[in-house]
Curated annotation (Swiss-Prot):
GO terms for biological process: glycolytic process. It is found in: Plastid, Chloroplast. Its EC number is 4.1.2.13. It comes from Chlamydomonas reinhardtii (Chlamydomonas smithii). This is Fructose-bisphosphate aldolase 1, chloroplastic. Pathway: Carbohydrate degradation; glycolysis; D-glyceraldehyde 3-phosphate and glycerone phosphate from D-glucose: step 4/4. It catalyses: beta-D-fructose 1,6-bisphosphate = D-glyceraldehyde 3-phosphate + dihydroxyacetone phosphate. GO terms for cellular component: chloroplast. Pfam families: Glycolytic. InterPro entries: Aldolase_TIM, FBA_I. GO terms for molecular function: fructose-bisphosphate aldolase activity. Signal peptide: none annotated. Belongs to the class I fructose-bisphosphate aldolase family.
Length: 377
């Protein structure tokens, strides 16, 4: 009887030990560096320049100004961006495409070194794009987990210190349970792999603007997606202090008749964040998602009119580059003017991050919409 009691006690002890081990928080070798990197990117008055367009998408941008899509033209445009004088005052990080990570200026200086001199943290797009998700109503899933650990290790060696993975969620097509879970689980696995390689993961489940849905439906979907995403990140022992989020703002669909101004967008977006995002997360870096330059800046400014538990900032591509590209036109003599346009937009969003943006200084071009239905990044 005593032996049975002893055995029972031993089994309970072993079971308790296993239970405790099962919930031990990860302790990776890069944890301190991840927290430091995330803090640098999420620094006051600064945000992210997203310049990670694929070569095909970059080609569309160049074609819009009559410039041929060659590696040299892509390099020249990217050099214009990263060498803008004083850019680091407003930009804390830049997301690069793989080609860009290894490119250099015309004088032979690596882009990553140019960025580091301005205290701009180099980042890298690591997903491999979207493909149709079987047995759903036109939804998609994101490729790129195969070999991601090796790629992240190589990107770290090349100077990258954060990563980005973009999945998308379509409201008109669902989202279905399978699409929502696939999106969330893929983001969680990516985040865990990136952290283990020393890269701060930017987590981006983009809820597309496509559709006629109202702002309440957008709120409902965003809350569901972020709940799933944080659940799976917790399961994968992702360290929340070493991640950044890149959500879409909570807005009505592009075809909804009931539009929402900055105050309402801010109200709904902050409501979603407070319900779903732990305060341990250092930074919320919003995507513009096809909003005009002016609209995306006004909405960000509205969200920073009162203190938030996180650094609420921007990670814009088109909303920073649209006027820049039109000013440049592929001509060397326009580089200085194009860089001035970039700095103007970067400063505007820096001011918005601090809640002190003044829209009276904007020109008509900033209000031009950039929404494209079914946009492929």
């Amino acid at each position: 009887m005593a032996l049975m009691m002893k055995s029972s006690a031993s089994l309970k002890a072993v079971s308790a030990g296993r239970s405790r081990r099962a919930v031990v928080v990860r302790a990776g070798k890069y944890d301190e560096e991840l927290i430091k990197t995330a803090g640098t990117v999420a620094s006051k008055g600064r945000g992210i320049l997203a310049m990670d367009e694929s070569n095909a998408t970059c080609g569309k941008r160049l074609d819009s100004i009559g410039v041929e899509n060659t590696e040299e033209n892509r390099r020249a445009y990217r050099e214009l961006l990263v060498t803008a004088p004083g850019l680091g005052q407003y930009i804390s990080g830049a997301i690069l495409f793989e080609e860009t990570l290894y490119q250099s200026t015309a004088s032979g200086k690596k882009f990553v070194d140019v960025m580091k001199e301005q205290n701009i943290v180099p980042g890298i797009k690591v997903d491999k794009g979207l493909v149709p998700l079987s047995n759903t109503n036109g939804e998609s899933w994101c490729m790129g987990l195969d070999g991601l650990d090796k790629r992240c290790a190589e990107y770290y060696k090349a100077g990258a210190r954060f990563a980005k993975w973009r999945s998308v969620v379509s409201i008109p097509h669902g989202p279905s349970i399978i699409a929502a879970r696939d999106c969330a689980y893929g983001l969680a696995r990516y985040a865990a792999i990136a952290q283990n390689a020393g890269l701060v993961p930017i987590v981006e489940p983009e809820v597309l603007l496509d559709g006629e849905h109202d702002i309440d439906r957008c709120l409902e979907v965003q809350e569901a997606i972020w709940a799933e995403t944080f659940k799976y990140m917790a399961d994968n022992k992702v360290m929340f202090e070493g991640i950044l989020l890149k959500p879409a703002m909570v807005t009505p669909g592009a075809d909804c008749k009931n539009k929402a101004g900055p105050a309402k967008v801010a109200e709904y977006t902050l409501k979603m964040l407070r319900r779903r995002v732990p305060p341990a997360v250092p930074g919320i870096m919003f995507l513009s998602g096809g909003q005009s330059e002016l609209e995306s800046t006004l909405n960000l400014n509205a969200m920073n009119q009162s203190p938030n538990p996180w650094h609420v900032s921007f990670s814009y591509a088109r909303a920073l580059q649209n006027t820049v590209l039109k000013t440049w036109q592929g001509k060397p003599e326009n580089v200085q003017a194009a860089q001035a346009a970039l700095l103007k937009r970067a400063k505007a969003n820096s001011d918005a991050q601090q809640g002190k943006y003044d829209a009276t200084t904007e020109g008509k071009e900033a209000a031009q919409g950039m929404y494209e239905k079914g946009y492929v990044y």
